Amino acid sequence: KIFLAGTIDNGDSEDWQTKICKLIEECTTNSKPIAVYNPRRDDWPEDDQTKLIEEQIKWELEHMEKADLILMNICGDSKSPITLLELGIHSKENKLIVFCPDNFYRFDNVKVTCERYGVPLISTKKIEDFVKDKILAE
């Protein structure tokens, strides 16, 4: 089970999660299914979001705990405050891999945190390439 944590920016950022879901779907077989938890929602309302926000937060926390692997993708042009919070929550677990370009405004925070807790940090490879080379190749 893989959780796709990272930049969403209220739906304004690149939809990298759907790309990863499609890539995994195209490359997996019925004999080796992979469950993917994608927190991005297409049905987010424009008006009152109060109830849905709480529901979404609880869903994400629950599914990050259930996941065997958390792929965290931080886009360089984003602030990603929730992603930074999630990095702090899950950095001591042995199931997190972080993708973050070195032009991210808080790259040093991400780098030092990952180093301290032994979290793999990939700043030179796109998440799509990693998924193809490391996850789907196994």
Predicted regions, residues:
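Conserved catalytic or regulatory cores that recognize and/or transform ribose-phosphate-containing ligands
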Residues: 1-138
